From Swiss-Prot:
It catalyses: tRNA(Phe) + L-phenylalanine + ATP = L-phenylalanyl-tRNA(Phe) + AMP + diphosphate + H(+). One of its GO terms (molecular function) is magnesium ion binding. PROSITE patterns: B5 (PS51483), FDX_ACB (PS51447), TRBD (PS50886). Keywords: Aminoacyl-tRNA synthetase, ATP-binding, Cytoplasm, Ligase, Magnesium, Metal-binding, Nucleotide-binding, Protein biosynthesis, RNA-binding, tRNA-binding. Binds 2 magnesium ions per tetramer. GO terms for biological process: phenylalanyl-tRNA aminoacylation. Its EC number is 6.1.1.20. It comes from the Bacteria. One of its GO terms (cellular component) is phenylalanine-tRNA ligase complex. Signal peptide: none annotated. This is Phenylalanine--tRNA ligase beta subunit. It is an enzyme of class 6 (ligase).
Length: 804
């Protein structure tokens, strides 16, 4: 929710500073996400170019004589292609800080001629990326005036992050009400218009719903004739621009303004484009609407719409249609203020993928008691800005909302917060927030205002009092200390799962959590797909069967990473698999796969050639590592042939304990299995049944902590350096690694080349540098800057030169 400081002060009488207001907003739960304070623009003035003469010593420069509103013109040297006599633009005088250049101007000489300022572009003021020429303003702007004041940029923009329950603060007035309750200012009285209506509108509206599906809870409308739909006033345009809305015309801007000012969404129709009367109903199969955003939406039978005799004219509560939109030719309008079912609005918006400011407010809940008043305020504003004459208001389907009452023991505050607050202060806070109360003593009946649908119980009232009184006044109370737990808390299964995770993470594998249900094709490929494991109501066809193995999910995850440029990958998961639907056929399993060259010792390229592809021995080592971690010595198990047919028959094995207990399988995957799943190799993997491992007689071994991985994608760049033969390649690696120890994840030599073309006693050493972003994705400029620093480091420490 964005608003400007002056906009807030239309509703809140206060002398508090911007910082004080922002601090108070955050303290009461309306957290300030960002403040756009462009006070740095106050030094820029509007100026007019009187003359433009070519610079005698430069082809692209001109000597400008600029009128700043002072007695004497200012001489400015300018190289903009659009600089010319008569142009009105923005001038920065000496001493002004230019944010786009990060410099403070001073008087300087350019090719021997003094310049006493600078005509600025939009980019230099950081107002847009346009830098092809200097700013051009209309000729009727006041010369010498502050550009920031003229453009409305002297008004700070505050952006708060609203939680979904605070629908009352989707308007500036609701925010002002909360601030007034803190004592930082006084809430101004809302001026209610007195409309002098002159006629009855001829348009009728009907609500066509069954009682079981009443999607419109009230519909009010007025007609205004003889309007002039010109541009909205500058003050309104400046505020809309400040919060990111594009001004369109007076009628549309008024509805947008009231939506953000008072939290009351409205819609305005061109009455001359409406055919017949309006019906509010559910959509029909095959109906479409070209909305105001230019897109065409296919409507369904669950979507609430407004229609005339020719079809749908608006998606109710979300967005109007292009056919009845208002433009400069509009002379007669219908202004609509309605109440829509919040759940219906949310469902329609999600189904259509349509987001709007109206939907944002209606699906959270608007004030039902403000429907008529909001329409009156909008009508008065239309009459004031667009002229014309207004009709009497018509209303259908509306019933006054019931006032929710909550019995509130004031002792609840102390019980929940351990704070003693005087009863009088408690009631004052509630009154300032708009709550009424009845009764005396320690228990009162509180009437909840209609704009607070989130207040449903006495705990909510305690929260309201506390956020205004000050959450910082609640003293932290430490939890009671408990005696050390002597008996084991974790079961054997839980302990083994934890130990296994540590062991596999210590071998460089990444833990994965995949779905417990997979497609029937995947299940059949791994010995599953039985009828009793099929879901009755699956999420999708690809998730219709309980998994018989962890491997299908891991293989799909590895392929997804390979498709995105990470062919070398090692994944594991510790979870359950299912042989059938009985409890004793559900097994706790540790499964893992390795892809490409992702061995235990690392993947990638080396100076003496590419690393080998993973094979059966890598899978065997991982499987045995799990057994060792769980306390079973690998020397006690037997390795035999006979792994399931999803493994390669000659490159796989079965791990047994004795002749009967099968602990797991490992091996390279069968090409036919990979082909069924549309997965490319090389790939190997294993599965160990954790619940079949005998309990150890000694404490399980410990392993290293798991890796801390960034969620951002790693970037790799190759560099080749020509260096003296006697220089050790490790020195190049060390020099490259030192360029940025935070971003550079690893440096590896993958090629060493010698040839006379490089020069006598020279060699080429190629390295791969892996960059791991931490806070944000790296831009091309970031990578280029780091590359230059890396080359500089290597050159300085080894005498090498970058090979082109």
């Amino acid at each position: 929710m964005k608003f400007t400081l002056s906009w807030l002060k239309d509703h809140l009488e206060t002398d508090a500073s911007l910082d004080e207001i922002c601090d108070k907003l955050t303290a009461i739960g309306l957290e300030v996400d960002h403040v756009d304070d462009r006070s740095y623009l106050k030094g820029f003035v509007i100026a007019k170019v009187l003359t433009a003469i070519k610079h005698p010593d430069a082809d692209k420069l001109q000597i400008l004589s600029v009128d700043t509103g002072a007695d004497k013109p200012v001489q400015v040297i300018c190289g903009a292609p659009n600089a010319r006599a008569g142009l009105v633009g923005v001038l920065a005088l000496p001493g002004t800080y230019v944010p786009g250049l990060d410099v403070t101007l001073s008087v300087g000489k350019i090719r021997g001629i003094e310049s006493f300022g600078m005509m600025c572009s939009w980019a230099e003021l950081e107002l847009s990326n346009e830098h092809d020429g200097i700013i051009e303003l209309p000729e009727d702007v006041p010369i010498g005036a502050s550009f920031a004041v003229y453009a409305g940029l002297d008004d700070p923009v505050i952006d708060i992050g609203l939680t979904p329950n605070r629908s009352d603060c989707t308007g500036v007035r609701g925010i002002a009400r909360d601030l007034a309750a803190t004592g930082i200012g006084r809430l101004k009285e809302l001026s209610l218009p007195q409309l002098g209506t002159t006629f009855e509108t001829s348009l009728d509206v009907s609500l066509d719903f069954s009682q079981s599906a009443l999607l419109c809870l009230g519909f009010a409308w007025c007609e205004v004739r003889n309007v002039q739909n010109n541009a909205s006033p500058q003050w309104m345009q400046q505020r809309l621009n400040a919060i990111g809305l594009r001004p369109i015309n007076a009628l549309v801007d008024i509805t947008n303004y009231i939506s953000f000012d008072l939290g009351r969404p409205l819609h305005v129709f061109d009455a001359d484009k409406i055919k017949g009367n309006l019906r509010v109903r559910c959509g029909r199969e095959g109906e479409q609407l070209q909305a105001l955003n230019g897109k065409v939406y296919n409507l369904g039978v669950k979507d609430c719409v407004i229609a005339d005799e020719e079809g749908v004219v608006s998606i109710a509560g979300i967005m109007g249609g292009e056919r009845t939109s208002c433009d400069e030719t509009t002379r007669r309008v219908i202004i609509e203020s309605a109440l829509w079912d919040a759940q219906s609005i949310a469902q329609t918006g999600r189904a259509l993928g349509l987001i709007s400011d109206a939907r944002y407010r209606f699906e959270r809940g608007v004030d039902p008691a403000f429907m008529e008043t909001g329409l009156e305020i909008a009508t008065e504003l239309v009459l004031r800005l667009c002229g014309g004459e207004g009709s009497k208001m018509k209303i259908v389907g509306y019933q006054q909302p019931e006032i929710r009452q909550i019995t509130f023991p004031l002792s609840e505050i102390k019980r929940l917060t351990y704070l003693e607050i005087e009863h009088e202060q408690t009631m004052t806070i509630l009154t300032q927030l708009g709550f009424d109360s009845e009764g005396q003593g320690n228990v009162v009946v509180v009437k909840v205002p209609t704009w607070r649908p989130d207040i449903v119980g006495k705990a909510d009232l305690v929260e309201e009092v506390m956020r205004i009184y000050g959450l910082d006044k609640i003293k932290p109370i430490p939890l009671e200390s408990f005696m050390e737990v002597k008996d084991p808390v974790l079961t054997v299964s839980q302990l083994r799962s934890r130990i296994t995770r540590f062991a596999l993470a210590g071998r460089g594998m990444r833990e994965t959590v995949t779905w417990s249900f997979i497609s029937e094709k995947q299940a059949l490929a791994f010995g599953g797909g039985q009828a009793q494991l099929k879901l009755v109501n699956p999420i999708s066809a690809d998730m219709s069967v309980m998994r018989p193995s962890l491997l299908p999910g891991l293989l799909v995850a590895a392929q997804r990473n390979a498709d995105r440029g990470f062919p070398d990958f090692a994944l594991f998961e510790v979870s359950n698999i299912y042989e059938d639907d009985t409890p004793d056929k559900q097994h706790r399993v540790a499964g893992g796969i390795r892809r490409g060259t992702e061995q235990f010792g690392g993947a990638g390229r080396f100076w003496n050639g590419n690393a080998r592809a993973v094979d059966v021995f890598d899978a065997k080592a991982d499987a045995l590592a799990v057994l060792e971690a769980c306390g079973l010595e690998s020397g006690k198990v037997q390795i035999e042939v006979g792994a399931p047919d999803w493994y390669h028959p000659g490159r796989s094995g079965v791990i047994k304990l004795g002749s009967k207990i099968i602990l797991g399988f490992f091996g390279v995957f069968h090409p036919a299995t990979l082909e069924k799943l549309d997965i490319s190799g090389p790939l190997c993997g294993f599965e160990i049944f954790l619940d079949r491992i005998p309990e150890p007689k000694k404490k399980a071994t410990k392993s290293r902590s798991p890796l801390k991985l960034s969620s951002l994608q790693m970037v790799r760049r190759d560099f080749a350096f020509v260096v003296d033969k006697m220089v050790d390649s490790s020195l190049i690696v060390r020099a490259a690694s030192g360029a940025d120890k935070k971003l550079i994840h690893s440096v590896q030599v993958f090629d060493v080349f010698e040839d006379l073309s490089l020069g006598e006693e020279k060699k080429s050493v190629a390295i791969e540098v892996a960059l791991q972003p931490i806070e944000r994705t790296l831009t091309d400029e970031d990578i280029e800057e780091l590359a230059l620093k890396l080359v500089e480091n290597v050159t300085r420490m080894t005498g090498a030169s970058l090979r082109c």
